[in-house]
A protein has these predicted regions:
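Extended repeat-based solenoid scaffolds, especially LRR ectodomains
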Residues: 1-3
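Surface-exposed intrinsically disordered loops and tails
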Residues: 113-128
Length: 180
């Protein structure tokens, strides 16, 4: 980790995962959280919780993997309508039977991750707001019979930019017998 000395509940410093993590289960709390390396849980039913006050980014071609554990990426946990979840090109979440939940706000299961930042996006012509949940080309969510929930919202304050609650292009979601 870098950027914070603690990653426990209540931490508000930005956190960067800069080396691969392998743990029985894992919880990371922070301001903005950058997942720049692979994360793997080693215990069966061991969950991953990434809870950010603002944004969560899973770097290109990086993976989060569990064995029947839930994966929860929870942005904008202070519920101030400013915090997105972004999976960059080729990133993957594999829960092998656990649920995958991407969202934000006060309650991960009923509120939304919220995009407010603009960027020039290579997948489209022009400028767009980063969506509440933004999954780039080649990303995948594979729950192998767990449920998948993706909840995002956006507030476009400019007529010169596009905005979407969810932005999914060239994305694979496979829940097996689970619900999406």
């Amino acid at each position: 980790f870098s950027g914070a000395t603690a990653v426990t509940q209540g931490n508000s410093s930005n956190v960067t995962v800069s080396s691969a993590l392998s743990s029985k289960s894992l919880e990371i709390y922070g301001g903005a959280i950058a997942l720049n390396e692979n994360i793997t849980t080693t215990g069966t039913n061991a969950d991953v919780l990434i809870k950010a006050i603002s944004n969560i980014n899973l770097a290109a071609s990086k993976t989060i993997t569990t064995v029947a554990g839930d994966v929860n990426l929870w942005a904008d946990s202070d519920d101030n309508s400013n915090g997105y979840v972004q999976l960059l090109a080729g990133a993957a979440i594999n829960s092998t039977g656990g649920d995958i939940n991407l969202g934000g706000g006060a309650d991960l299961m009923s509120d939304y991750a919220f995009g407010t930042t603009t960027e020039t996006c290579p997948e489209v012509v022009g400028t767009q707001y980063i969506s509440g949940v933004h999954m780039r080309q080649g990303t995948s969510l594979n729950s192998n019979n767990g449920n998948i929930s993706v909840r995002g919202q956006n507030a476009n304050t400019s007529n010169a930019a596009m905005s979407f609650g969810l932005s999914l292009r060239g994305v694979t979601m496979n829940s097996g017998t689970g619900k999406i």
